[in-house]
Regions:
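Bacterial Sec-dependent N-terminal signal peptides
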Residues: 1-22
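Start-of-domain marker
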Residues: 20-87, 98-100
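Second-shell loop/turn segments in exported
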Residues: 31-38, 126-134, 246
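Sec-exported extracytoplasmic/periplasmic mature domains
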Residues: 49-57, 149-153, 265, 269
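Acidic/His-rich structured neighborhood in mature extracellular/periplasmic domains
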Residues: 82-193
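Flexible, glycine-rich surface segments
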Residues: 159-249, 253
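A cross-kingdom marker for long, charged
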Residues: 214-300
Length: 300
């Protein structure tokens, strides 16, 4: 009886503890591509999901319910079958649960318009972190490291540093790539700019924001709404504002406010003091005036 119980407990442990960090979904929209066998799109989707979800990206142990939910919505703009070249865009999103609630919050969202790679039907996807000579795998390794690092940052201050440095190293090693999106200073909003800015010393307040907003703010709201909102206000008016001022050329604060706008508006609409709402509004409007409709809701 004891032997049976021990075996069951051991099996339960291996079923619930996972080395893998991600629960990823891949969607491939190929409506703009005509005259191509749909089988290759379904094949690529399945291979990418298997790659993302089976790969062990770090040495950390994640419980099954701790795996990071993320999605990659790829739109194929052009597919050159003979050369195996895919010209795409990709909307990348990652979420995390909020403590003691059924609510999930977005921790990263980005539209990558330079999502170009090569892939031929039946091609094997063999990943080697030391030598990433496959553009398709480089793209998904980049976002996997970035998502895991950001997620860890939201649970402990600078907690994602190790894995984020791996993301930065991958990007630095891709500087000679013929594919777009990797080059330093080609764009303020490409893959290089995102990870380089995120890891720059002047942007430490932005990483502090990640911890204060999510862990000290949102996670606290289930226990004490007022205290949680106060922490969020401090994160925005101190951390986010300082990051924007110290590194005014970085697009990270704007990208962050683009995908947090609805959540932030709901946190303050009809709640909080007039002074608190005014201070938060001023910071957000100065960073991203294009989202003024959302910021106006804060003052209600």
């Amino acid at each position: 009886m004891r032997c049976t119980l021990l075996i069951l407990c051991t099996l339960f442990h291996f079923l619930t503890v996972s080395a893998q960090e991600l629960t990823a979904r891949v969607n491939i929209n190929h409506q703009q591509v005509q005259g191509t066998d749909n089988a290759i799109f379904e094949e690529l989707k399945e291979k990418l999901e298997e790659f993302l979800n089976a790969q062990q990206w770090t040495s950390l142990q994640f419980l099954e319910h701790e795996r990071i939910s993320c999605s990659f919505n790829i739109t194929v703009k052009e597919y050159k079958r003979e050369e195996g070249i895919w010209s795409c865009t990709c909307m990348v999103q990652a979420n995390r649960p909020v403590y003691n609630s059924a609510y999930t919050t977005t921790i990263f969202q980005f539209q990558d318009n330079d999502f170009t790679f090569t892939y031929r039907q039946f091609e094997n996807l063999n990943y080697n972190e030391e030598i990433i000579d496959n553009q398709l795998l480089a793209l998904f390794a980049y976002y996997s490291y970035l998502i895991i690092g950001i997620d860890l940052d939201t649970f402990s201050l600078y907690g994602g540093s190790d894995v984020l440095n791996r993301c930065l190293n991958l990007t630095n090693n891709a500087q000679n790539s013929e594919f777009p999106g990797w080059k330093a200073y080609d764009s303020r909003k490409n893959r290089f700019a995102i990870i380089n800015d995120y890891m720059e010393g002047a942007m430490e307040p932005f990483r502090t924001l990640q911890y204060n907003y999510y862990r000290k703010g949102l996670d606290e709201m289930a226990n004490n709404v007022e205290r949680g909102r106060t922490e969020i206000s401090t994160a925005i008016t101190e951390n986010l504002e300082k990051a924007h001022k110290d590194r005014s050329t970085s697009m990270l604060p704007q990208i962050w406010t683009d995908y947090k706008k609805d959540e932030i508006a709901n946190i303050y609409k009809g709640k909080g003091t007039a002074k608190e709402k005014s201070q938060v509004y001023d910071v957000l409007f100065s960073i991203n005036p294009s989202q003024s409709n959302s910021w106006d809701l804060i003052k209600q």
